[in-house]
């Protein structure tokens, strides 16, 4: 499983990349996409939606199952990855790059301190 340095990770297998201007991008980890199998549908959040840690950010459907993506941060959704609507398999192909799900403007940056480092996440998934 690929785990990228420089990202933060949640116990629900989401990753967080810190951007500029108090914003972060969020997606699911390589571990999560591998567990789900081939993703065939993505239900994205609405731009402008206020979200809190632990709330459902998006829903994914794969050939094996359906799964919610829980927000690892609190804030306002300012951008979503529209490409996923027509090509949800991008998440399988490139979960840390083109497969990002949303950009969130943080309401509280201290939540980043509660997330795991790459090393901690590797231990969490038993790598």
From Swiss-Prot:
Cofactor(s) for this UniProt protein: (R)-lipoate
UniProt key word Phosphoprotein: no
Family annotation (PROSITE patterns): BIOTINYL_LIPOYL, LIPOYL
Residues the record lists as N6-lipoyllysine modifications: 64
Keyword Heme tagged: no
Keyword vocabulary terms for this entry: Lipoyl
Domain (Lipoyl-binding) ranges: 23-105
GO biological process, one term: glycine decarboxylation via glycine cleavage system
Function description: The glycine cleavage system catalyzes the degradation of glycine. The H protein shuttles the methylamine group of glycine from the P protein to the T protein.
NCBIfam families, per database record: gcvH (TIGR00527), PRK01202.1 (NF002270)
Subunit structure comment from the entry: The glycine cleavage system is composed of four proteins: P, T, L and H.
Name of the protein described by the UniProt record: Glycine cleavage system H protein
Organism: Coprothermobacter proteolyticus (strain ATCC 35245 / DSM 5265 / OCM 4 / BT)
């Amino acid at each position: 499983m690929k785990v990228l340095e420089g990202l933060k990770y949640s116990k629900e297998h989401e990753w967080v990349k810190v951007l500029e201007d108090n914003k972060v991008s969020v997606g699911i980890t390589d571990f999560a996409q591998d567990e789900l199998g081939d993703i065939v549908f993505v239900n994205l959040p609405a731009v402008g939606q206020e979200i809190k840690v632990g709330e459902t950010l998006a829903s994914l459907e794969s050939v094996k199952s359906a799964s919610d993506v829980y927000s690892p941060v609190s804030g306002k959704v300012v951008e979503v990855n529209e490409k996923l609507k027509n090509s949800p398999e991008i998440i399988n192909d490139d979960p840390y790059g083109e497969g990002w799900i949303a950009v969130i403007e943080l309401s509280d940056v201290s939540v980043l301190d509660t997330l795991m480092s790459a090393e901690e996440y590797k231990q969490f998934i038993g790598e």
